[in-house]
Swiss-Prot record:
Keyword Protein biosynthesis appears in the UniProt entry: no
Membrane-crossing residue ranges in chain numbering: 569-589, 605-625, 641-661, 682-702, 726-746, 763-783, 790-810
Organism: Mus musculus
This protein's name: Taste receptor type 1 member 1
Subunit relationships: Forms heterodimers with TAS1R3.
Tissue expression remark: Expressed strongly only in fungiform papillae.
Source lineage: Eukaryota, Metazoa, Chordata, Craniata, Vertebrata
Amino acid sequence: MLFWAAHLLLSLQLAVAYCWAFSCQRTESSPGFSLPGDFLLAGLFSLHADCLQVRHRPLVTSCDRSDSFNGHGYHLFQAMRFTVEEINNSTALLPNITLGYELYDVCSESSNVYATLRVLAQQGTGHLEMQRDLRNHSSKVVALIGPDNTDHAVTTAALLSPFLMPLVSYEASSVILSGKRKFPSFLRTIPSDKYQVEVIVRLLQSFGWVWISLVGSYGDYGQLGVQALEELATPRGICVAFKNVVPLSAQAGDPRMQRMMLRLARARTTVVVVFSNRHLDGVFFRSVVLANLTGKVWIASEDWAISTNIPNVSGIQGIGTVLGVAIQQRQVPGLKEFEESYVQAVMGAPRTCPEGSWCGTNQLCRECHAFTTWNMPELGAFSMSAAYNVYEAVYAVAHGLHQLLGCTSGTCARGPVHPWQLLQQIYKVNFLLHKKTVAFDDKGDPLGYYDIIAWDWNGPEWTFEVIGSASLSPVHLDINKTKIQWHGKNNQVPVSVCTRDCLEGHHRLVMGSHHCCFECMPCEAGTFLNTSELHTCQPCGTEEWAPEGSSACFSRTVEFLGWHEPISLVLLAANTLLLLLLIGTAGLFAWRLHTPVVRSAGGRLCFLMLGSLVAGSCSLYSFFGKPTVPACLLRQPLFSLGFAIFLSCLTIRSFQLVIIFKFSTKVPTFYHTWAQNHGAGIFVIVSSTVHLFLCLTWLAMWTPRPTREYQRFPHLVILECTEVNSVGFLVAFAHNILLSISTFVCSYLGKELPENYNEAKCVTFSLLLHFVSWIAFFTMSSIYQGSYLPAVNVLAGLATLSGGFSGYFLPKCYVILCRPELNNTEHFQASIQDYTRRCGTT
């Protein structure tokens, strides 16, 4: 398939060549376009600019027009001549071998195709012949240098590819030419646009420009460059508000350019990237000046960044700031002097073709004969950089030929050289040229660097300043931003955004199709904005919190009722005092156990009551400090059980007094049965056992455990136990309420008992304090769930225990210690007799 495709291509080439043959021969030419040698190199240079017009016939354009001379191409033309002469004069490179050349002016696509076919012509002939094996093709040149732009290079590379003839371009930078399947013989000494596009995007990012316009020139260079820029910039957060291509035949101010300027103005972008060749760029910027598009930042691609074409546009100084990417500045030593000597040598009219020789079309430069040392084209920085690329390209071919001919021994072998053999060697070259390494990767691309430049209008004439550099593989920018003179006030960096950045903690809500246009919304509480994802708020971790509109999460404060907090110290002191009073009362009652006061209070039953209050008091210590499993298991159940035992004893004590004084004579059988069967003890045991069963069920089914509570307060972690408001807790509490009511009823029935046995008021006070304390606790727990809730629980428990102690035991302690005269049998008998008389009178 490839064989027939190659033959089809050759047939087409032959046909075109024959169609042009009769119109291509010249009778005169300029000296310097050809040089005989052992091996010939071809060079394609644009000594004249093409006339941009539509052609209807495939005729070769005559480049030698008086109004189209291209000084830049002239310098590159001279650079190749100079380099070949320098190599021929060298004894280290290609000794005993002389290089020659054939140079062509390729001002148009047709002249470029013609020159390429001339290069492919068989050695010793002026035409191509059909061949079965292209590997044996022997053309009169072994390699080709050029051409100067992507469009021409694509054509030339496609024609040379079947023959594998090396094509080393000095200015064609399009990434499409790196494809080795289509262009296996293409190499270049200018970096690929792949890197240029990366450098431009990095340049935009370094200044925070995310809202841009893209303009390209018609053709592969501009259109592919704009496409690559958009594809690379969009994933990096840069939005393209406007994109267009300058038409091939456009003129400044024509309707098409006016529409483009209008759309560019409406895009409201401060930064415009112009990826264009220097020829169409002039049309674009003349239109920019006519439309008065000022105050912008223009980013230049390397083809026009330091070209003198654009600065010569009238009014260009007012368009704004121009930054650009340029090939690294290098000098070709001796080139300027070489051009001056050439001018002196060719001064005069073109020569006539020698009889019998072939002078190819577009090997003529009439302007070159009119130059003097005073009016010759100025060799500026732009042309010098490109000339160095030509210099490097010729040296790369020479080194490849040096290796192929085995010249390392001091002499070179002579014999036929096929282009494909030379191509293999050129890929392998690796040498130093004026301290710069020359080598190619597997795609034929060189090692290289870019300069970052800024235009400077401070002086009387246009200049540019190198403000930074860009290294490749990987791409790295180094920019001195202080060197840039911005067009805005106070030399401030212009801003180019659709929407200004949101405040910290505000995420972007995209509006429309461009992600650079958005509204700013605050992040909700508990979320934060991560700088790596500006469109979505991220939730904080479990142990973290964030207020509304936050850019970071903060660690939650862990809170619990600590031992050393002021409120804890107060409660601990009060509870310890109560505990000491309970123990002291137990000791006092043991000392005065057989006195009437202790016996009337219940005798030995008082120790059970005091012990239950001590258990409840001890349980309150487990509310302080970090909750632990033992503390959670003991604190509420132990308190509840202790107070239940106390209430059971208090209830049965009140009930016994009522039976003794009111029902012993009325219902003697019940009284004797109750007394003989130890009814009081049975009741206390049964009641306590029931409550113990409830507590065990509570612990088994709703086991209190330490937990970290995150929901109540966004910025806090509350360490607590899970027993609060659990079903087990409420059931146990309900049992205590039932006992409290029973105690109140029994004490109320005994309100008319003898004074020393009438405890209705004291018991009522104790129970009232109990009810009020726990009502206050449940009310507080329903509205407050903070770290001080255990303190409220302790306070409620302390009030309950204090109420029980002060209501029942404290009056008796007072009598024992302060009124011993009332603690005797006679006083109690008198009180009973008084009660009997009152009952008898009623």
